[in-house]
Design a protein with these regions (language model features):
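A conserved ligand/cofactor-binding region detector
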Residues: 1-823
Length: 823
């Protein structure tokens, strides 16, 4: 499967042994598991380093355009196994470890997931980096080196408890600190302007500011089967003066450590709770911190080889992954004008050819806005620039739509006391893309309609994708080997080749083999559940899985309400013909998101009742997997029978979990939302189960009204029974009010928020019927196996390789740079 003629087994073994000595002063047989992991990781890194150096040299030599992919999150997962696979030396390295008495799985389990992201946004960025390196395109990922990530989730008494995710406590063996590139980032103070006598230009200087030093840490991104090693550059913050000794000596201890704390706070956690002012301020600081450092460094790199910054766009493109890095627009303008001496029009010309924006959400609340007071106080010069961009943009709007105040209200960057980041990104970006066909259509016709009418040429769609190297080759070795046995290993770098499996869909032997692989993966997950949850689950039951961020629009609540309904049905009809079903949830709720956290408690309370009811003979089990992340996700995707993708239609931009499940042979149970629409197009409606309102219907109800959940409550006895159980103590005997907020959210208008905002009761019956169809289909093993195989065979479109090639062709205009073999 791999050409590893370059791999020197003896040298690799020798390196592991010597690493163990030099890092820990121990022989292999004395080291603990973490020390063994570190010793192996450094030995793998040594192999990567030569390619990494060669990559940077070749990039410098060929001087081709580079994309800087800016993202608040990079959900990388574990690096060791992935690097071994992409070096095409997994089996050989595994053999060396066995000779040294190590089990590769135990060693891999010692590595914490890199806590640099939370949800799909960050995982997409990680998949994109994998594809960019594999496809040999020059690229940097730019982000923050969070000390604690978002949080590690623990479940105590059924409640989510957030504890710090101290993923760096043993160090990250794959990163390299680049102290030689310190970059100063300034906050606060005021802007002094003066006229330059020589040039007659107005000059602007930020004074009385507080500063931190951004220090980059570089993490290698290894391409599969190529010599390319790209870089994820994550920034740490250090005080400009490490320690203010004179203040300390004068007894002003507070001031002495102030600078230290300013720096420390910036990189502490991902998405600090912004329910309060200090949290909002910290988020904006984080965004400007990593964007300013990344843009400054990119321009410095450009200037090492080029004199004319007016041609920056020929060599550099900044891709903004969602609105978080949008301040890059104004920061680039600031550098070009204040430091490089360009006039406004020249700087604007460069900026609008260099920056491109990906929109990831239809939810208006997630399109970031900052109070003017906060923005202008924290980033005074940046605010001046945004003000001027806004003034000119509003003039353009007025010229195009005279007297249309409504257009200005919707499109202005600064309006109603707020700075609107999405509007800034669209105004300045040369490309604006959505992440699935339906999502892009909704942006163009609904959410961003005014922008689309004014500048349609900017808008385009790039349907998301996932890397098959992690989510099939690494996550599901049994299935990967089976596919390679049937069609060869070309699918690893060209996922469309999976369609060759279609000739086997009616082959009884292949169907059986596939069911056997799924069964073994379910046994692996059942073992994980027993170990972590203490619950026995039956691998012969249907594994029905919903793992994703916890948000009301993703409707974990619909899922658990249906479980409550199904439980009632089984209790009433003990002889009911139902395939045993294991409902598996995994989700983190944002720390300040009250109803999401109550939903987790509800799921766990329902699990406690159902899992301990012997009278139903194990027909239903409910499992909540603690601290869902990439590494346990890999075990889950491989084992799922049913993929729950049940967001309210029109709300999920794309989703990528749906693709990971499909690639591993799960049946999609979902609404026509996000990329589900395209999955159904690829696999055929008969190989998925679709339910619920369409996005058009949802949007119509939202705009015109006409939906009253109380009507359903009054007329549907089963739904009423389930909702009453939220408040009659069935699942909370010690506190009947515990789930009152959930009950109220479904039935009562609250302020300007409509009852059942996400149409859970409206879609409930349709969902329950869809679940019955799943039950029937699973009873026909041959038909189910055929559907499984068709799902795998139809997943070719959903590789991030395809997505990246589209970005390259339509937006970035990059050229491949082939890295020759390292001698």
């Amino acid at each position: 499967m791999s050409n590893t003629s370059w791999f020197n087994k003896d040298e690799f073994k020798k390196n592991i042994i010597s690493n163990c000595k030099s890092l820990f002063r121990k022989n292999i047989d004395e080291a603990d598991k973490q020390q063994l992991f570190q010793s192996v990781a450094y030995a793998v890194k040594e192999i990567i380093i030569d390619r990494w150096i060669a990559t940077q040299k070749e990039y410098a030599k060929q001087d081709k355009k580079t994309v800087y992919y800016m993202s608040m999150e990079f959900l990388m997962g574990r690096a060791l196994g992935n690097n071994m696979i992409n070096l095409m030396a997994y089996d050989e390295m595994k053999e060396v470890l066995e000779e040294l008495g190590m089990d590769i799985n135990v060693i891999e389990d010692q590595e914490p997931d890199a806590a640099l992201g939370n949800g799909g946004l960050g995982r997409l960025a990680a998949c994109f980096l994998d594809s960019l390196a594999t496809l040999e395109y020059p690229a940097y990922g730019c982000g923050i080196r969070y000390k604690y990530g978002m949080f590690k989730q623990e479940i105590k008494d059924g409640y989510q408890v957030e504890v710090p995710d101290n993923w760096l406590k043993d160090g990250n063996p794959f990163e390299i600190k680049r102290s030689e590139y310190p970059t100063v980032v300034k906050f606060g103070g005021y802007v002094r302007s003066y006229r330059d006598e020589k040039t007659g230009r107005d000059m602007f200087v930020q004074e009385d500011y507080r500063a931190v030093t951004a220090i980059p840490y570089d993490v290698p991104v290894v391409g599969y089967g190529v010599n390319t090693v790209n870089t994820l550059r994550i920034w740490d913050a250090e005080p400009v003066d490490t320690f203010n000794l004179s203040s300390f000596d004068k007894g002003d201890y507070q001031k002495a450590v102030e600078e230290e704390n300013l720096a420390k706070n910036i990189v502490e956690v991902l998405y600090p709770n912004d329910n309060h002012y200090a949290g909002k301020e910290l988020r904006l600081k984080q965004q400007y911190f990593f964007v300013s450092a990344s843009v400054q460094r990119a321009i410095a790199q450009y200037k090492e080889r080029h004199d004319d910054v007016r041609k920056l766009y020929e060599k550099v493109t900044f891709q903004l992954n969602d609105t978080h890095p949008t301040v890059a627009v104004a920061e680039l303008m600031r550098i070009l004008m204040d430091e490089e001496g360009l006039e406004w029009d020249e700087a604007w010309d460069v900026t609008t050819k260099t920056v491109a924006y990906t929109n990831h959400t239809i939810m208006a609340e997630a399109l970031e806005k900052w109070p003017i007071e906060l923005f202008s106080r924290l980033l005074p010069r940046i605010y001046q620039i945004v003000e001027e961009i806004n003034r000119r943009f509003v003039e353009e709007i007025k010229a195009k739509y005279p007297g249309n105040q409504d257009k200005i209200r919707k499109m202005a960057i600064i309006y109603d006391g707020q700075v609107k980041m999405a509007n800034l990104a669209i105004c300045a970006g040369y490309s604006v893309n959505g992440v699935a066909k339906l999502h892009t259509e909704i942006l163009e016709k609904q959410e961003l309609k005014d922008f689309y009418e004014m500048m349609p040429e900017k808008f385009n769609n790039k349907t998301n994708g996932i890397t098959q190297r992690r989510f099939l080759l690494h996550a599901n070795p049994l299935l990967a080997a089976w596919i390679t046995d049937k069609i060869g290993d070309g699918w690893i770098t060209d996922l469309t080749q999976l369609k060759k499996l279609k000739v086997y869909v009616d082959d009884a032997k292949c169907q059986q083999e596939l069911m056997q692989i799924k069964y073994k993966n379910k046994v692996r997950l059942a073992k994980y559940i027993k170990e972590h949850n203490g619950i026995d689950v039956d691998p012969n039951s249907i594994f029905d899985v919903q793992v994703k961020r916890l948000h009301e629009y993703k409707r974990q609540l619909l899922n658990i309400l249906h479980v409550m309904y199904l439980y009632n049905e089984v209790k009433k009809n003990p002889d009911m013909d139902i395939k045993p079903r294991t409902f598996i949830f995994g989700a983190k709720a944002a720390a300040g998101y009250k109803i999401a956290k109550q939903t987790i408690k509800l799921i766990n309370s329902v699990a406690d009742v159902i899992n301990n009811d012997a009278s139903i003979n194990g027909k239903i089990k409910v499992v909540f997997i603690e601290n869902y992340r990439v590494s346990n996700g890999e075990i889950i995707f491989a084992a799922a029978d049913v993929s729950e993708q049940i967001s309210t239609a029109s709300k999920e931009a794309s989703g990528t979990g749906n693709m990971k499940f499909m690639l591993n042979g799960a049946m999609t149970l979902g609404t026509m939302d996000g990329a589900n629409v395209e999955i159904v197009q690829e696999v055929g409606i008969e190989n998925a189960v679709i339910f619920g309102l369409s996005s058009d219907e949802v949007i119509r109800y939202e705009n015109e009204g006409g939906y009253d959940p109380m009507e359903i409550f009054n007329n549907d006895q089963d739904i009423r029974e389930v909702l009453m159980e939220l408040i009659n103590g069935k699942y909370s005997p010690d506190d009947t009010e515990r789930f009152r907020d959930i009950y109220n959210s479904l039935l009562n208008n609250q302020g300007d928020r409509r009852a059942d905002t996400y149409f859970i009761l409206k879609d409930f019956r349709s969902y329950a019927d869809a679940q019955k169809i799943i039950n029937e289909r699973y009873s026909d093993e041959k038909a189910w196996a055929k559907s499984m195989m068709l799902n795998i065979a139809s997943a070719g479109k959903f590789s991030s390789d395809r997505t990246i090639e589209e970005y390259v062709h339509d937006i970035w205009k990059l050229e491949k740079v082939h890295i020759p073999d390292v001698k």
